[in-house]
Every structure is written in structure tokens, then in C-alpha cells.
Amino acid sequence: NLDFIIVDMPPGTGDTQLTFAQEIKIDGAIIVSTPQELALQDVKRGIKMFDKLGVKIIGLIDNMSHFVGDDGKKYSIFGEGGVRKTAKEFNKEFLGEIPINPEIGKQGDLGSPIVESQPDHEISKIYLNFAEKIKSIYL
């Protein structure tokens, strides 16, 4: 049985997203964005498009929200709070943040998702938390 299928689409509201939403019954969309203003403009158009098409928006995720330097300080190099603010503006749930962490790319390059190879890693816990939130909506 297939409970969920997640489709990673290119940014924006172009033909890919529109055709997908019109041709396939979608139970919900999760919008993932970096916190830059230009990216958030696409997010706002995407929210309006999905709302118009009757596709439920499960929530928004802030990707590459920050990184923690060797000094232990948090650096928000792409801006801070934009995705959360956009979620609030459109009355959508803010699901959380994914910080920049080189381990994500490293494990991906090795063909081993971080949630499998390092289930106790902070990033794994973030991903699993998203999965639980999404699951709780549908199950």
C-alpha cells in the first residue's frame, strides 16, 4: 500500500505545478521555501494557485533557515522569519525550520538518507517531526 507520495517540484507556479494539480487528485501540498524575499514571492503565488484549485495546503517549511557556526552561534544568512510570517499572513500552518547542515548533503551523496543512517541526528529528528505532523493530519 502507498500511504504518501511526495513530489519535489521546481520553485514557482509554472506549468509543472498547474498541470500536476489539475491532472492528479492531490490531498495536500507542503510548501518548502528558503526565507529570501524573492523566494517568498513565489510562495505567495503558489499559495494563491493551490487555494484557487482547491488543494489543501498542509503547511509551510522554512528550508535553509540558518546554520550554527563553529562558535555555536545561529546565523540566518538568507533572512529570518519570512516563511513563518508568510504562513501567518495566509492563515496556513508553519511546520518548522530545516537548518543548513552539511550532513544532509553528505548522506544524500552516499545514497543513505540521514534519517536512516543517523536516526538520532538533530536533522533526522526535524524530518521525523514533520512526518509525524503530516501523518497526524491524515491518519
Regions found by a protein language model. Name each.
Residues 1-3, 139:
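Active-site phosphate-binding and catalytic loops of NTP-dependent enzymes
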Residues 3-107:
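Conserved catalytic-core segment of NTP-binding enzymes
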Residues 42, 122, 126:
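Charged catalytic carboxylate motif
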Residues 46, 112-113, 130:
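Alpha-helix boundary/capping detector
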Residues 131-139:
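Short, hydrophobic alpha-helical segments
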